[in-house]
Regions:
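N-terminal strand-loop element at the rim of the active site
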Residues: 9-10, 18-23, 27, 34-88, ...
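Donor nucleotide-sugar binding/catalytic pocket of nucleotide-sugar-dependent glycosyltransferases
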Residues: 155-197
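Nucleotide-activated donor-binding/catalytic signature segment of Leloir-type glycosyltransferases, i.e.
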Residues: 256-279
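Conserved donor-binding/catalytic core segment of Leloir-type glycosyltransferases
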Residues: 209-225, 231-234, 242-245
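A short helix/loop element that forms part of the nucleotide-sugar donor recognition site in Leloir-type
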Residues: 194-208, 259-261, 364
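A charged, aromatic-enriched C-terminal amphipathic alpha-helix characteristic of glycosyltransferases
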Residues: 24, 344, 358-390
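Glycosyltransferase donor-sugar binding loop
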Residues: 51, 241-258, 277
Length: 394
């Protein structure tokens, strides 16, 4: 580990722990790594073999040593997923001891079962290794196992950390212990998706009329996105079509069959399309090219940022959004690239959707300004400021 007090170019090396392979998190970590490496910092990403950038040329080094958790509902599969999560942090420990990086970055919150894996990392932090994290969701309310174990895991995981990158002012209920230093940074753009040519016309494939208004709900199918309220809204807004596109990460939440049955019961099955699988990048381009607007209708507990907002901005697509007070609301209302409505309300969604359908699209200059502000350069500037702050250098 290099000594920042005697090294004006500190940090010279950063080890990124990227344990996910789906959704926006691995892309977020990739773009951070690319920008760090562009500045001459030696970056190694510890990731899974199925990381979405594993087969692509990168400016940084990929160490594909994390275990791949199995899929399935059985007890054995669940136990193996827990083991993979815990073991991954010991793989990280081995990589640290071998590489001796200047700092470690976690791609996202990783406190689950930290009561088991955190202790050697706490020791390394105490010995001077700075650990920082991307605080995509600073409100932590999900527990695994007994509540005491969950609270201990949360405390232990945050004891590893010295600082975090956050997308706005900490929302109400954020878990930020007194020792945590934070730095506000923008959520950068996933530019590789916008560079893809759509491989097909999604409207044509789904049989959607050219004059229909297509509302796209993109990404993981989860209850907190209020997609059932979007289906209810379709029944009340003739001329609107809903496309839900993304995988279902949990069988404990409403899935594709639920939304199809709901749409059939409400008489709008011909205007609700559910594509319940992982959407490759080129098909993501087809989804946004076909859409007139994107739905980010989170429930009131959501106080984070959404990578789908950045995707919508790249295609100049306005958003219909909801949620609690947090970075998503600030971004939508501050940029003027969409409408933010009351969360958890079908009536509010209907009103917002009708407003989008009746109004001309936002000025393209607003999208351009939003894209200009959502830069990875600014994100990494903030990361380096944070690292120097936690080392007492800035």
């Amino acid at each position: 580990m290099s000594d920042p007090q005697s090294d004006p170019k500190w940090p010279r090396s950063i080890l990124i722990y990227s344990s996910s392979a789906a959704g926006g998190m691995p892309h977020y970590a990739h773009y951070q790594a690319q920008e760090l490496a562009r500045r001459g910092i030696a970056v190694t990403m510890l990731c899974r073999p199925d990381h979405p950038w594993a087969a692509s040329p990168t400016r940084y080094t990929m160490l594909r040593g994390l275990p791949v958790p199995p899929v399935g509902r059985g007890l054995v599969a669940k136990a193996l997923r827990v083991w993979c999560h815990i073991w991954g942090h010991f793989v990280l420990l081995g990589a640290i001891m071998q590489m001796r990086p200047s700092a470690v970055l976690f791609e996202e919150n990783t406190e689950y079962f930290a009561a088991i894996w955190a202790w050697p990392h706490i020791l390394l932090r105490w010995l001077g290794l700075p650990y920082i994290i991307n605080l995509h969701d600073p409100v932590r309310a999900l527990w695994f196992g007994p509540r005491w174990f969950g609270r201990l895991s949360l405390w232990a995981a945050y004891r590893v950390l010295k600082g975090g990158l956050i997308h706005g002012e900490p929302p109400a209920g954020a878990y930020l212990p007194r020792w945590m230093v934070t730095e506000i940074v923008p959520h950068g753009l996933f530019g590789h998706m916008a560079e893809r040519e759509p491989p097909f016309d999604l409207r044509e494939r789904l049989g959607i009329a050219p004059d229909a208004f297509v509302l796209l709900s993109f990404g993981h199918i989860t209850d907190r996105k209020n997609q059932h309220l979007l289906v209810e809204a379709m029944a009340q807004v003739p001329g609107a079509v809903l496309v839900i596109a993304g995988p279902q990460p949990s069988t404990r939440q409403r899935g594709a069959a639920f939304y199809r049955q709901q749409a059939a019961a409400l008489g709008c099955a011909d205007r609700v399309h559910v594509i319940d699988r992982f959407i490759p990048d080129d098909e993501a381009a087809a989804c946004f090219a076909a859409a007139d607007a994107a739905a980010l209708t989170y429930d009131r507990t959501f106080v984070s940022q959404s990578g789908v907002l950045q995707l919508a901005a790249q295609w100049n697509r306005p958003v219909l959004a909801s949620g609690g007070d947090g970075p998503l609301r600030a971004a939508v209302e501050g940029s003027g690239i969409g409408i933010f409505v009351e969360p958890d309300s079908t009536a509010a969604i209907v009103s917002g959707l009708q407003s989008l359908m009746a109004s001309p699209p936002p000025d393209p200059a607003r999208f351009a300004a939003f894209r200009e502000s959502a830069s990875w350069e600014a994100n990494v500037d903030g990361m380096l400021r944070l690292l120097r702050r936690v080392k007492g250098l800035g």
